[in-house]
Regions:
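Extended mixed-charge, aromatic/glycine-enriched low-complexity segments
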Residues: 49, 53, 61, 65-66, ...
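A short helix-loop-beta-strand connector motif used in the catalytic cores of GNAT acetyltransferases and
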Residues: 72-82, 87, 142
Length: 201
């Protein structure tokens, strides 16, 4: 049996269906779900374990569905969130220390590695969870001064970041991660990227 830590306790992790991954109480509802929210204001934003966050990302992320939990927890800082209504998930977010080795001030920055929204999430879910996470990180991560995230220019226009007060920090050409000395998994995208950032302090 595989275990994961939740609020400091080791809990059993089961093989669940897609509906059950979304459900915080699958054993009681058996994936039946709850009422569907009609407004993003009805969503409750809470921390979640990295396994569930990665599984939700695999369900919903249009461009980067693959992210292994071990690539998250090996970082100095990491935290995952979920947006729920009636104990059903509608969005997930995965943060960690910046993955770029040469990133300046890496010890005082957090990177939004993934933000995935379900198709049935209410309008403005992304902007609501971005705002809530900013306030949470400002309050609980006292050593973090900067938030960053990378936009895939082939699929997204950065509207959500712009509307949430983030600024463009840099633009870069897409490239493969695999090199002669280090073989990687198949790239999910090699399109150009824009790095957005938000100063917390």
């Amino acid at each position: 049996m595989v275990l994961f830590k939740c609020d400091g306790r080791e809990m059993p992790r089961m093989n669940l269906s897609a509906d059950n991954v979304r459900d915080s109480i699958p054993l009681f509802r058996n994936g039946g779900g709850g009422s569907i929210p009609t407004s993003a204001h009805q969503l409750l934003f809470v921390k979640t374990n990295v396994h569930r966050a990665c599984e939700l990302n695999a369900l919903w992320h249009s461009r980067f569905p693959k992210i292994h939990w071990s690539n998250v927890v090996r970082n100095k800082d990491y935290i995952c969130f979920v947006a729920e209504h009636d104990m059903m998930a509608y969005a997930s977010a995965i943060w960690s220390s910046p993955i770029a080795r040469n990133f300046e001030n890496a010890n005082t920055a957090l990177e939004l590695r993934r933000l995935a929204i379900s198709k049935d999430a209410p309008k403005n879910t992304a902007s609501r969870i971005l705002g809530w996470m900013r306030r949470y990180l400002l309050k609980h991560f006292h050593h973090i001064n900067l938030l960053i995230s990378y936009q895939d220019t082939e699929c997204h226009k950065g509207t959500i970041y712009k509307a949430s007060g983030w600024n463009i920090a840099s633009r870069s050409k897409g490239h493969k991660w695999t090199c002669r000395t280090r073989k990687r998994n198949k790239d999910q995208s090699i399109s150009d990227k824009i790095r957005w950032q938000l100063c917390l302090r």
